Design a protein with these regions (language model features):
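Active-site glycine-rich loops that stabilize anionic/oxyanionic intermediates
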Residues: 13-16, 206
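Conserved alpha/beta-hydrolase
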Residues: 29-51
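Gly/Ala-rich beta-loop-alpha elbow adjacent to hydrolase catalytic centers
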Residues: 83-88, 92
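Flexible "cap/lid" loop of the alpha/beta hydrolase fold
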Residues: 100-135, 173-182
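Helix-rich cap/lid subdomain of alpha/beta-hydrolase
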Residues: 121-168, 172
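Short beta-strand/loop motif that positions the catalytic acidic residue
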Residues: 196, 202-204, 208
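Conserved alpha/beta-hydrolase "acid-adjacent" motif
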Residues: 209-215
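Catalytic active-site module of serine/aspartate enzymes centered on a nucleophile-bearing elbow/loop
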Residues: 227-271
Length: 271
């Protein structure tokens, strides 16, 4: 039987940086885990630095980001638990499909090719960037961030979260996610029937405007060859760090630790 994973890799989402995991990482470290929260390539700087010079986002796409994380995971001595939020949850699915990881958790995960749902709230949340097809990157203003990330909170509370965590996002990543179903060779795609991948937990938040529960539930149902679970937390928005986050964090870790295994398809490149 495989040893229980001792490492957790946290992958942030669009319009965020590893800072968004600061409380989760601290909690998991207090439980004895080695916690890595690497940035998307080029986004290693602090939130303030990226906001001052977002040109570091130019050229980022899904394949570049996933390859980056696969390299990090491949340098570990054993497969970790991989957790991703939003696009990070989409990347988690791709990494598991490649044979990386002992278990995966997607929090409000971005959908992959084959999931046809495109709720109007998702379109509205993404429109500040999608509406400008020639933009290489773009951020969310106070009202846009409130709608997308913190709609269960007051505007004032949302502004505090935005000031601490929000950065512009690379437009190409968003386009590859939203339009995956229209791309023949979409980077945001997996083999739903891959039986060698590790188990995965799909977590949805009932009030999420960016990735509402239904698309996540439909996505989880497409995985028929591996253990998966869908869990919905009521009254929560897209941002995973609002009050009560500890319940979500503990549920995610408990599930991953209980279901973790060494994927049969792990290759030397991912070990």
């Amino acid at each position: 039987m495989a040893e229980a994973p001792d490492t957790i890799v946290l992958i942030h989402g669009l319009w965020m940086t590893p800072r968004s995991w600061e409380h989760w990482a601290e909690r998991y470290r207090s439980k004895g885990y080695n916690v890595l929260a690497p940035a998307w390539p080029g986004m290693e700087g602090e939130v303030e630095a990226i906001n001052a010079d977002p040109s570091v986002l130019e050229g980022l796409d899904v394949e570049t980001i996933v390859d980056h994380y696969q390299g990090i995971i491949g340098d570990l001595s054993s497969p970790p638990i991989i957790m991703g939020h939003s696009f990070g949850g989409g990347f988690t699915q791709i990494l598991l499909d490649r044979g990386a990881g002992a278990a995966g958790v997607g929090l409000a995960p971005a959908t992959v090719k084959g999931v046809r749902d495109l709720p109007l709230s998702t379109v509205r949340a993404a429109s500040p960037l999608l509406a400008h097809p020639f933009k290489k990157y773009g951020g969310l203003d106070e009202k846009q961030f409130h709608y997308a990330f913190a709609n269960t909170l007051s505007q004032e509370e949302s502004d505090k979260i935005r000031d601490r965590y929000a950065v512009p996002g690379p437009a190409e990543v968003l386009r590859e996610g939203v339009f995956a179903n229209f791309m023949r060779h979409a980077a945001m795609s997996v083999d739903f029937e891959n039986a060698s991948r590790a188990p995965m937990l799909f977590i949805a938040f009932s009030e999420d405007h960016v990735v509402p529960p239904k698309p996540i539930q439909h996505m989880a149902e497409k995985y028929t060859a591996i253990p998966v679970e869908y869990k919905e937390f009521p009254g929560r928005p897209h941002f995973p760090g609002v009050a009560g986050w500890e319940e979500v964090a503990d549920y995610a870790l408990d599930w991953a630790a209980q279901h973790a295994r060494t994927p049969a398809g792990v290759s030397e490149q991912t070990r």
